[in-house]
Structures are given as C-alpha cells and as structure tokens.
Amino acid sequence: MLKIILISFLFVINLYSSEVYLLPKQSDDAESKISELIQEADSEIFIAMYNFSYKKFANDLIEASKHGVRITVLFDQKKTKKDDEILDLLRENGIKTVVNKDKNKMHLKVVLIDSKTAIIGSTNWTKESFEENYDLIYITDDKKLILKLKEFMSKI
C-alpha cells in the first residue's frame, strides 16, 4: 500500500514541470531560457509587464512575430509615460501593444506562451533587474495556473 501511495505522489509531483531562477546569480540562465521559450513559440505570446526596457527580449519578440507568432504586450500607463522606447519599437514592428488605462497600477510580470507555458515572478524585463536585483522567475507548464492567469489577465 505504501508503494502505491509513493508512486502516486511521485506521479503527481512530476505532472507539471517547473523551473525557478534566483537572480542575479542565475540571470544568464534565466535570460537564455526566456529567449529560448520566445523563439520556440508556435502561435501566441501574451505578456503583462510593468517595466519593460530590455531590448534583448523586445528583439526576441520581434523575431517571433516575423515567424507568425501573435504577440500582445500589456503595459502600465504610468510606467510607459516615463519610458516608451520599447512600446514604440514593438508597435513599429507590428506587435500588438495595449496600455492599461485603469486607475489601478498594472504591476504584473507575467508571460504566457502558447497557453502551455507561464513565466511569472518579481522580475521586470529590464537589464537592471537581471543584473542588479534580487528577483525570482518561475517557469511552469501547470495547466490550472495558466488558465487562471489567462482568465485574470483577460479582465485587465
């Protein structure tokens, strides 16, 4: 009986794959993984990012868009007033950008890729966040979590 319980437990644990990156120590690995996931996207990427000024990821998104991936990036209105270089770059390259005009701050750091992968955490997409900050990035294919994130973000 104990064997059955242990096997069942191990199956449930391995049902979803996930990775955690602790920055700044694992910044290079996290950057590489995010770029890889963007490049491997098949159909769609949805991003809600409070602070997005890292050109490396913008260029990855532009390349994915050129290969037919539909991309939407949600920005916070107050933050884009201060720095809109990435917003303009993405728009110029045909990527759909949405600026949250709600009175509430859009402080999310969420990426959904093909409704199969979620990237969440405390990390903004800025060079400083990857080089100087203590931050966390969590990547998962947990279907329940992805569905919950999609539902939540569709209401913003």
Can you name each region flagged by the protein language model?
Residues 51-55, 77-81, 103-106, 117-118, ...:
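Solvent-exposed loop/turn segments at secondary-structure junctions
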Residues 30, 118-156:
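Signature of lipid phosphatidyltransferase scaffolds
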Residues 4-13:
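Sec-dependent N-terminal signal peptides
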Residues 81-112:
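Ligand-binding grooves and catalytic loops that recognize ribose/phosphate and carbohydrate rings
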Residues 46-48, 72-75, 98, 118-120, ...:
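Structural recognition of the beta-strand scaffold that forms the well-ordered cores
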Residues 24-30, 54:
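A general structural motif
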Residues 15-18:
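Boundary at the C-terminal end of the N-terminal hydrophobic targeting segment
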Residues 34-92:
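Primarily the HKD phosphodiesterase
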